[in-house]
């Protein structure tokens, strides 16, 4: 944009200079004094004029010359004023000291006439093209007309090369992408096996989980060209531009094959066609159609691998997700506790941390945080430390940053009455006591009555470990914990406030999900009741969200939700009445301390004593021999490849062992059969036929009396040692 503005400014300055020179040449550089007709006649009559020149021009006579004081002057005489013109001419001729001339009308040159006509047209055309190119995002200069050119940027792997070891908390996702790296490095072994590498890989996951970073790591490991573009860069105000940019993108990719094309937020262009409001957008549909053809159409895109990222796979067009286009979908989820610790090490490598900082403990306190959330957490902690003039980031800074990220900045200057503080303290104490009693699912980490964001206070409840499933008792405990604040207000003040609205919203949502989604209602049974539209209106889906159950079922669902909430309300009330002493003690302590951490809460609840927490006394022993100290935060390409080769070798060893065991067993059976056959022949040679048959039966109970057992109604088994064809 700045370059385009400079170009326009230079052109404008050049135009002004040319116009000024042209005006100077035509006007000889002098600006004469303009006289009215009466002033001119008066000076002529007085004899004040030294020279006089009359020249016809268009509809007037131009009068110019010099006065006796050597001042330039000019005036005009209208064409229809012939009488005055004749009078002025006679008067000028009669004056002896006056140099009088009459010139013929000068015809304007063709060049000047064309220039005068074309300059406004050229200026308007230039401004039109410039603003049009700006609307298209093409910039100025030589890119003005490049509407259909791709906006993809080619990433240079040599400047900021990202490796698999730089990506933390996504080891399984890297294992899924390892074949892409191998194919870009050397595709001979895949061709020998007749394999077809996936043409496209769709990275699906919540925002901030590292989908773009994984794509860059694939390009960095393979050393291949990496084209990066956003899905919104294809669709513009003109129809056909998006399809043209798709064609140009693949043409550039073919010139640099093998390479990677990465489309971020592909749902902007890959939304399902003709669905919902805005679904029938012609430009987007044309762009998507061109993308589908380029990925898997009549043309061959050998060596081009598409990687796309989205957090809304449900709205993508089915044609985009079929095999041959995006063959593989990789779920990039939020990291577990080990992944969060590795990510914290990645983002803390350029930050001075105090000895009190325990990144493992922080990872345990941040369940559900994505990589972007953890980076923001440490950045907030560094800003807090810098604001307070510290040289290092300590654990208190990280605790404060965690509270800011979860609940917002503290509103310590907010004026709150004593009554409101008392209500908030008992409200949060109710949550805390329920959390201490029902700690199967979650435990209390911190409780505060300092206002943050929209909340007057909050209790931080953390799960004991990362959870992927929740049982019915755990969900009921969660509802009970959410109701603890309102029940505590009711018990202590016999009146309720508006502070529990968010608690009710969350509790009701959990109860409704238990009934309609999880099948946890004994009355309605293990059924799922959902709307046909998926429960939400989105521009890529139909807006109709009609329920697929009757009004009577809807009434029963509401009754079941009410029953669950009422039962947990009464259960919560009984728990708080049984622990009323602890409830009042925690509320009283909150009014004086304002914030309590887990260690203090446990001591108050079990011992009735408030301990002092010394953050500076904690020292974390760091393992200098760990991979983090060597700058390795995740499994590298070599580590993953070595693990896969080792797994392959282990499978081969197990298969070989199985084959050896089977061969050994077959040889044993064959030897036993030969021994039995030899004994049978000896007995038959030394006795008559009847005795032979009798003795044969005594040696082999399964012998039928035939030299070869008949193979009647028995399927052929190649491993059967009793089958003569296998001997």
UniProtKB/Swiss-Prot annotation:
Co-factor: note: Binds 1 zinc ion per subunit.
Membrane-topology annotation of the record: Multi-pass membrane protein
Cofactors required: Zn(2+)
EC number: 3.4.24.-
UniProt-annotated stretches for the region Disordered: 645-727
Membrane-spanning segments: 7-27, 111-131
Keywords: ATP-binding, Cell membrane, Hydrolase, Membrane, Metal-binding, Metalloprotease, Nucleotide-binding, Protease, Transmembrane, Transmembrane helix, Zinc
Pfam annotation, one family: AAA
Positions that bind ATP: 205-212
GO BP term (any one): protein catabolic process
Top-level division of the source organism's lineage: Bacteria
Annotated residues for binding of Zn(2+): 427, 431, 503
Extracellular compartment segments: 28-110
Ranges of Basic and acidic residues composition bias in the record: 645-684, 691-706
Family of this protein: In the central section; belongs to the AAA ATPase family. In the C-terminal section; belongs to the peptidase M41 family.
Quaternary structure and interacting proteins, as annotated: Homohexamer.
UniProt-listed PANTHER family: ATP-DEPENDENT ZINC METALLOPROTEASE FTSH 1, CHLOROPLASTIC-RELATED (PTHR23076:SF113), METALLOPROTEASE M41 FTSH (PTHR23076)
Name of the protein in question: ATP-dependent zinc metalloprotease FtsH
Organism, as annotated: Staphylococcus haemolyticus (strain JCSC1435)
Source taxonomy: Bacteria, Bacillati, Bacillota, Bacilli, Bacillales
